[in-house]
Amino acid sequence: MNVNLRPAFVPCRRLAGAAQRVHQPPTASGAILLISLLLLATSLLAAPASLEQSALWTAGQEGYHTYRIPALLVTAKGSVLAFCEGRKTGSGDHGDVDLIAKRSTDGGRTWSPHSIVHEEGGDAKITIGNPCPVVDAKTGTIWLPFNRDNKAVFITSSTDDGKTWSAPRNISATTMKPDWDWVATGPGIGIQLTHGAHKGRLVIPSDHKHALASKQPEWNSHMMFSDDGGATWQISAPIQTGGNECQVIERADGSLLVNTRMQGEWQGLRGTATSTDGGATWTPIMHEKQLPCPKCQASLLRYDEKRLLFSNPFPPEPKDGKPSGARVHLTVRSSPDDGKTWPIAKRLHKGPSAYSSLARLPDGTLLCLYEGGEQRAYETLRLARFNLEWLTEAGSK
């Protein structure tokens, strides 16, 4: 038997026709379908919105009456350090107050017991506080400035990822003026500059109050900075005028933007100013009408090249046209254009809330350590862990 293994003959005209059908451009409806499928695939791949919250410190537990003034830092190795003031005998700003810290090596999911970074005088009424840490990306060293009784500036450092701390040194001689009678670092975090002539500079947002006899504006913000890796520190010109607790970021163009709590007549708004010389001098403060705020600290963080994040209490609209002074409803805001506009806002905590500190993990996850409670803002220091999808999802305003 003869078996013919050759393929069946197909006329060239039909092959040509088939080829034409295969290579015909898609119709408009086909293009729309393709785009729809791509958008669907993208949405399926996007991370779902996520928010987790828990109390990191609770008033009356772990040896202290109240925990206040949070600062949250991600180290060069990706560990998370949470700092605060442990107030032993009451919730007031002055008394027997220690600077304490907890440490996490799993992105803020679990934490070490707290340790005392610095305290003085045992049970004496000495206030150690206003933490404002910064990490030197070149060396991995963590620098932690703080205050004693708001009359002196000290700094300590860690070279082992926040496990232990050096003996503090007093740097008041180069970081205070003789006519100041009050000074504070932060509270919050400092930054290291990444652009231009001052690349590598460590910058610590700060504020001070002049003695009344000096006849200077009573309140002003300023910066502390170091150009030698933390060995020596100096201060900027004052940021005029009326600023208080502040935070600073470096913009994409290398300029600096400071956002400050306002004292006096502009208490209901935030203040902003800019610097083009690495923070040494500043424009006069402008009043930021997009960011209403009671008289309270706030947090400012760079998320990526253009996006900034901001957190603060956001009280309801006043009925009489006057800004509300209530510290309630901690809210996180997002700016897509380096702080020019703030179109996105999401409430993180409903009810009493006050100071906060934002941080970004290497994978983009966000953390916010903030003061919040049901009846009082200082019942707990709460840690929120969330992603950008939660902040930007529809209906977030």
Question: Which residue stretches match the model-derived regions?
Answer:
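Bacterial N-terminal signal peptides
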Residues: 30-43
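Asp-box/BNR beta-propeller blade signature and adjacent active/binding-site loops
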Residues: 47-397
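Intrinsically disordered, low-complexity regulatory regions of eukaryotic regulatory proteins
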Residues: 20, 28-29, 83, 369
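Low-complexity, intrinsically disordered short segments enriched for Gly/Pro and polybasic residues
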Residues: 25, 29-30, 72
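Intrinsic, low-complexity polybasic segments
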Residues: 5-22, 26-27
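Extended rod-forming repeat segments used as scaffolds/tethers
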Residues: 11, 30-31, 92
